[in-house]
Amino acid sequence: MTDLPQNVRWQLWIVAFGFFMQALDTTIVNTALPSMAASLGESPLRMHMVIVSYVLTVAVMLPASGWLADRVGVRNIFFTAIVLFTLGSLFCAQSSTLNELVAARVLQGIGGAMMVPVGRLTVMKIVPRDQYMAAMTFVTLPGQVGPLLGPALGGLLVEYASWHWIFLINLPVGIAGAAATLWLMPNYTMQTRRFDFSGFLLLAFGMAALTIALDGYRSTGLSPAGLGALVAGGSAATLLYLWHARGNERALFSLRLFNTRTFSLGLFGSLCGRIGSGMLPFMTPVFLQIGLGFSPFHAGLMMMPMVLGSMGIKRIVVQVVNRFGYRRVLVASTLALALVTLLFMGVALAGWYWLLPVVMLFQGMVNSVRFSTMNTLTLRDLPDEMASSGNSLLSMVMQLSMSLGVSIAGLLLGAFGHNQLAADSGDAHGIFFWTYLCMALIIALPALVFARVPDDISKNAVIARRKRSAS
């Protein structure tokens, strides 16, 4: 990348900062949830909506982001994304009730949904194809640093300032990023086909209705009849989309994607698998602070080994898959994640806190292997003309499953705690014990899906040899 013009390098820095803001926000909030609950006068059992509202909004808006960038221009959409994200951060910091905070997180999620995919599209347009991989490695590095800093930084701000600062720190970065985008970034546009608004609205309503209904009366305040209407409406919208997409070449996501068996298995496995693993970033800081009495900063520091393990293992994932095959790796990593989840709970409740960083490191390693393998399996056999659509659908499902996972974790805590959760008490230990047992079962279930993956590693071996010869 040394031969790139100076203005292109600045444009890559802008995209990198966008990636950093979005990645930091996905992890910095988790550590602050118990403090937010105390400040807002809410039960900690309701605070999962702060996470769900953001992640679900990202899932809903992702399919529209690429089309908007092509139609309106990458600079205009990237600028809008940063502005919405920054305004959402400001409104989050000013929120005095949970409902206000959830509404502000929705606005923040709209910006976050456009920031990363439009950033990828921007890189594709401003650098030569032979330098695309190097450029993407550069802009995604801050996105990897964000999850590493997020939990500890969130805990530090909460403990020594207030939870409002986890959102206020986005303001100077957002203002600088928005100004730099207008000044330096070109506004590339492309001829686009008509956007499938009907399909988009059906999928958006279906995802939102079913996720909200999952929270039940405890979070929504709706009557049983109202919840039933949400379930019926969400299910009907999903079925209507399937009917709408049948034989429709302009559909948001073509059903022909599912003619590829590995895509179908990988997508369904990703949905189920990320529901389980999506519980962990929410549950871990809540358990450490409410169940064990850790300070916010201490809880944030305890999350760092998980991120380090996730980053460190990535270098050998390809070799592991080439050696053992997708099926064995996915089944083994899924069952290992369930076991390490139980181990974390057991070690914590036994008071062996010195072992927790080791368990968290192993958890991050297992989770990373599983994520990377799931992603590759899902997309590897798709025809070139369907790769972009398949990748967009996978990205949407990843966000949706994480929102479902957080919702289910909140549901389990509420069910076992009878909607009451006192900090660092014997009752809290029992509540978390049964919650973690159920979580481990949910995490393990996708192994049944992955057991159906064809046991064929030849294609990966060819890819690995090409990579070695090119290096």
Curated annotation (Swiss-Prot):
- Transmembrane portions of the chain: 12-32, 49-69, 77-97, 106-126, 138-158, 165-185, 197-217, 225-245, 263-285, 290-312, 342-362, 396-416, 431-451
- Organism's domain of life? Bacteria
Q: What is its main location?
A: membrane
Alphabetical list of Gene3D superfamilies matching this protein:
MFS general substrate transporter like domains, Multidrug resistance protein D
InterPro entries this protein is in? MFS, MFS_dom, MFS_trans_sf, Multi-R_MdtD
> What is the topology of this protein in the membrane according to its UniProt annotation?
Multi-pass membrane protein
Q: Name one GO cellular component term.
A: plasma membrane
Protein's cellular compartments: Cell inner membrane
Renumbered to this chain, the signal peptide range is none
Q: Name one Pfam family in it.
A: MFS_1
The alphabetical list of record keywords is: Cell inner membrane, Cell membrane, Membrane, Transmembrane, Transmembrane helix, Transport
* UniProt keyword annotation of Membrane present: yes
MF terms in GO:
transmembrane transporter activity
Q: Does the keyword Flavoprotein apply?
A: no
SUPFAM superfamilies linked to this entry: MFS general substrate transporter
The entry's family comment says: Belongs to the major facilitator superfamily. TCR/Tet family.
The record's HAMAP family line, in alphabetical order, gives: MFS_MdtD
Q: What is this protein called?
A: Putative multidrug resistance protein MdtD
> Which source organism?
Cronobacter sakazakii (strain ATCC BAA-894) (Enterobacter sakazakii)
